[in-house]
Amino acid sequence: MSLDNDINTKKRKLQDDEKPRKKRKHKRPTRDDDADLDVEAGLNRAFARMDGQLLADHLAQKTRRFGTELSSVELNDLYISAASIRDSSSFEKDRTLENLPSFLEKFAQEKEKLDEAPKKNGSPHTLIVAAAGLRAADLVRACRKFQKKGSPVAKLFAKHFKLEEQVAFLNKTRTGIAVGTPQRLIDLIEHGALSVENLRRIVVDASHIDQKKRNITDMRETMMPLAKLLARADFKERYTDEKKHIDLLFY
């Protein structure tokens, strides 16, 4: 090989070495809870096994993930303690719409009649929190067992219902069970139309997943309002209060 050819070969090798190497495509890691996602049933089965501590940790992790604009103090105000959450892992049935009445009955107070409404208008004993209006409508239908004349299940979500209509409904109607989305429930409480005076339990529809395998804690637009709703001072102080206790349950 001539000297010129040898020099040209070395130049080409140096040029090849200087070319940026193509990055290897990494496969997207599988979600830790993929095994618990039952798409056919529309359930994330992990929630059925979580006790108060696991749920508190899960909520804190999601709040930190979506609350990036908040200070550490503001985030801390949104955290819920394990002691605030009632353990419902003893419920053995699938957490489907059909089994919601059984769940409510299992964790109701002794001799409590869920189809009866407190005497004060707009003051339910049970709040059920859903991710979206369509799901909330399904939950309302699932609770028909507890609906009777003088105690309708309240529909407190934005889809097809204006805030003013719901304010008017609550002002003139007694209701035992109310189903709503986080932000609309906050708006109605702050408006003064939805009273929490007689509230005995909050049930978060957590196991349900949508077609994209997301539950109420998996989306910023639902998780952050949920965190703010559950961490309200008038709720937080009652999670561990014996006299005016509120059960916080995750279905």
Curated annotation (Swiss-Prot):
Coiled coil: none annotated. Keywords: Nucleus. GO terms for cellular component: 90S preribosome; nucleus. May play a role in the regulation of DNA replication and cell cycle control. Belongs to the CMS1 family. Transmembrane segments: none annotated. Gene3D superfamilies: P-loop containing nucleotide triphosphate hydrolases. Residues 1-37 are annotated as: Disordered. The keyword Thylakoid does not apply. Pfam families: CMS1 (PF14617). This is Protein CMS1. The gene is CSM1. Signal peptide: none annotated. It is found in: Nucleus.
